[in-house]
Curated annotation (Swiss-Prot):
Keywords: Antiviral defense, ATP-binding, Endonuclease, Exonuclease, Hydrolase, Nuclease, Nucleotide-binding, Plasmid, RNA-binding, Transferase
Organism: Thermus thermophilus (strain ATCC 27634 / DSM 579 / HB8)
Gene3D superfamilies: 3.30.70.270, Hypothetical protein af1432
Note: Encoded in a type III-A CRISPR locus.
Single GO BP term: defense response to virus
Stretches assigned to coiled coil: none
Gene name of this polypeptide: cas10
Protein name: CRISPR system single-strand-specific deoxyribonuclease Cas10/Csm1 (subtype III-A)
Taxonomic lineage of the native organism: Bacteria, Thermotogati, Deinococcota, Deinococci, Thermales
Record bears the keyword RNA-binding: yes
Catalysed reactions listed for this entry: 4 ATP = cyclic tetraadenylate + 4 diphosphate
Domain writeup: The N-terminal HD domain has ssDNase activity. The C-terminal GGDEF domain has the cOA synthesis activity.
Family note: Belongs to the CRISPR-associated Cas10/Csm1 family.
Region (Disordered): 99-119
Domain spans labelled GGDEF: 542-702
One term of GO molecular function: RNA binding
Amino acid sequence: MLGDGLSVALAGLLHDVGKLYSRARWGERDDQVPDRTHTAYTAHFVREHAGLFRGAGLDPDWLARTASRHHEGWRDRPQYRPETPEEWCVALADTYASKEREEGEGGGSPPEVPLSPPFRRLLLGGEEGREGGYSPVGAGGRVGLEAGGLYPEERPNVSKDVYKRLLERLEGRLEEMARFSLGKEALVLNLALALQETLSLVPSDTQSEPDVSLYDHLRLTAAIAHALWLFHGGSPSAQNLRQDGEKFLLVVGDMGGIQGHIYRIAGAEAGVGGIAKRLRARSLEVSLAAEAMALGLLWRLGLTSLNRILGAGGKFYLLLPNTEEARAALEGTREAWGRWALKRGGSLVPHLAWVAFRGQDFRDFAALLKRLHEALAREKLRPFAFLASTGGVLGAPLRPCAACGLEPARRDEPGSLCPDCEREAALGARLPRSDRVGFFLEEAPRPYLDFPGLKVGLGGPLEGAFHLFRARLDFAPWPDPSEAKPLLGHLPRVEHALKAKGWSLEAYRAWAEEEGLLEDEEPHPEKVLTFAELAALSEGAPYLGALMLDADRMGEAFATGFRREGRDLATPSRLAALSRTLEVFFTTEVLTLLEEPRRYRERLGWDDLEAQRKEARYPLLYSVYSGGDDLFLLGPWDALLDFALDLERLYRLFTRHPRLTLSGGFLLVPPSLPVPELARLLGEAEKRAKAEGRERLFLFGQAVPWETLRGLRAWAEGLRQDLRAERVSRAQVYRWLLLWRRFSPLEDPGERMRYKPLLAYALRRVRERDEEAWKRYLKLLDHQDPAWAYLPVWVQWALYRERRV
């Protein structure tokens, strides 16, 4: 059998799967596989499932040989040395993808060596991450990767028995696949999903630094093998394959103007185009635009999504063959997407850049990325370079869209929207009922996003799509090519309000009518809550909470975090693992904390009452955007502030790195505040938090370290109870605020201390009401105590919790 590119990619994807078998059966006699090498087990794996591979048009014997014969240096086992061009292609891809193995060291029994987190070796501010490893099998019956599984432990659960459980899961997934009639690409991507589930938490190599998962290594090997095979036109000689040259293209795609595009919505009221639906749809459009550009390129060249080696947050990196066809596809894509952007007002600007490189350049991937980013910077200096002249003519004046203000409205009447904003509202309404995203080459179910060469629809099952995104980390086989990409986020609906308040639908309708919140759309459980409803569901003052968080030092982490004296450890596998793991946090972990907070009860130390409260309140939060390394959430302000504290704690547990922290801004705003203004204020708040040292949340006018904020939460709750019991009056509290604002900003230390006698005098009123309360608030006389330093934060927190306006 002469291999095609997809078959060679499959061999690359499976080449080290035998390591799972060898570790599960470590030290045991195995009559089926006498030499017990991982290469022998790889061949055994393929032959055990020969029917599955044969059903997809593959020769199992060819696949077994091509996948297992990838060790050129095994001179004492010639049966595993490459001979055919296909075998050499996989062997070379394995070598290029394994540069971290050259670091040496390591040891220990392979089944007992845990996978270290990708953050472990990041050197930031002179510090590396803490020791720890992943448990591939966890509490509650977890086997492999799922929400809550990527938290390092000091004593991870890893052993032969754990590998046996993983092997059972993998075998079970293949049995499920056998029930479908799978094409070759669907088989490749279903296998990739099964390997992602079972091999994401085990190391590729246990004899060197074990910080690259076996899944990440297999995926990258498949991508390199596919690109290398296509470079040679599908019929190379072994000699031509082994001769190095600029056979690869590394491509970066970047959507510019993301925040401006998402937040450029003129109408902020729910009645103007249904902003609660449209804002999430517009954010999703940005993510899907980048994905559509990447998938369109890969499809044109006959590659799979495995060749998207990095990507998140409107940016992607592709590994392509350096062929005339690939370069022509890149040029055509750049122009087609540029014209698409111009037609839509130019608020979202796609950029595409690439560099050619040799196989040996995988050795210094950091230098390769630097070249690529320089090319991208040059590309950004000349957007829409394909335009020779405008060539446009003025048309009849049209009313601008009432929502975006960029495109002409469909009708010349007040409040009329452009077709794109109308579609966003329809997509937003469809989001709660969708469990997948489909990419179509021709017609797609309406409403859909219309990108150059592709249409993208939401819902299920989306027949006719050539590629699907799953909305959850779901690894069960599907009949069509797909991957797990949780991009749809969370929209709070009426059903969540009913659960949080213990209401019936009739009670909810009566409440909405009394609050003046009823719209034209009749209430039903699937209806998306408006911003006004979310504000009214706050406990305390009816304001909308807004939270923007960003991962600190991530740019530094990717650029120089793996750099050491004389060498750079930033291999493509390490960077892919870092990107993928970070994406899991900002998509899956954030989403799961929103929708299923009880999962984190033990990890975050909640009691029953606290877990019950969070389970009712957190689903009311609205994810405008969460992915890459940042997020933007809205919702009832009290629930959102609690959520921010829990999420920051989870992030620390997730990274176990003292320099990997979160910074951001939190605001209370009226629900009618225009979205562009809200985004601007949040951006300024986030900048203030970072400017004052990072690892802070800016709220109520101050940037507060997270651990300090947890202590202030107790002060806020204590004051709230004192206000309710009338142990402290509001006048007393406003007096404290007045003294703080008068004296704290003073530059002279002595002058700042003048607040103390005035505060002591004011506190006499508290003593008259309650002696114990008075003793607690005497701490405010210590000017170094956080309770005084950040008094406006906890005082306003308590006042807003006790106020309805």
